[in-house]
Swiss-Prot record:
The keyword Cell cycle applies. Its main location: cytoplasm. One of its GO terms (molecular function) is microtubule plus-end binding. Plus-end tracking protein (+TIP) that binds to the plus-end of microtubules and regulates the dynamics of the microtubule cytoskeleton. Promotes cytoplasmic microtubule nucleation and elongation. Involved in mitotic spindle positioning by stabilizing microtubules and promoting dynamic connection between astral microtubules and the cortex during mitotic chromosome segregation. GO terms for cellular component: centrosome; cortical microtubule cytoskeleton; Golgi apparatus; microtubule; mitotic spindle pole. The keyword DNA repair does not apply. This is Microtubule-associated protein RP/EB family member 1. Pfam families: CH, EB1. Belongs to the MAPRE family.
Amino acid sequence: MAVNVYSTSVTSDNLSRHDMLAWINESLQLTLTKIEQLCSGAAYCQFMDMLFPGSVALKKVKFQAKLEHEYIQNFKVLQAGFKRMGVDKIIPVDKLVKGKFQDNFEFVQWFKKFFDANYDGKEYDPVAARQGQETVAPNLVAPVMNKPKKPLGTGSAAPQRPIVAQRTPATPKGGTGMVKKAAGDDESAGLIEQINVLKLTVEDLEKERDFYFGKLRNIELICQENEGENDPVLQRIVEILYATDEGFVIPDEGAPQEEQEEY
């Protein structure tokens, strides 16, 4: 039977988003690029097979799942494995299959602790276990996809992203019948590609920022609701929440704003 893990609080033991992806990819020989791609449930099923061989019907897992009902089917397999091994954790399937960062990141943080508590270090061939099936990244639709200038796809698919590298309709001179490619076109295309990748990185960082800000806001509300209890622990939490960097001065709301940068 499995060792149950109940702690879900954010601690220094939690891996960052990038470290978590690296651990998953290395352990299962996958190529995930986003936490949201865990919404298919396939990776969790294979981790359960690694921890407790035979606990899940791995043949029923759709490693190439692309549709929500296929994700749900995978999580049903995972739920059956949890029940078989006595895992008490309730899987928020309805939230996970939506492919949102916050829900999937919270669940994988718990799962990593669960894995560490149960893994005995035995060797495991993930590719052979899934019979060589290649996984397919879920077709996630980000909430900012309506921005006209946002590049499509993920950072890993950058080389296949169509980029118009400032192709100018120059007329051939000297009767050669050929349009010479400007020397700076390759460099421009490379710079545009770097910009696109950086935009995606910024978007991911903003999601992560909003995720942790939401947690801090919830903590603040709890402290405010119990403000009259004079609990020293709550008071200490409030002090930490409102602490500022050394030398930081809160600006006077009535003072005119000066020295703003001009662009």
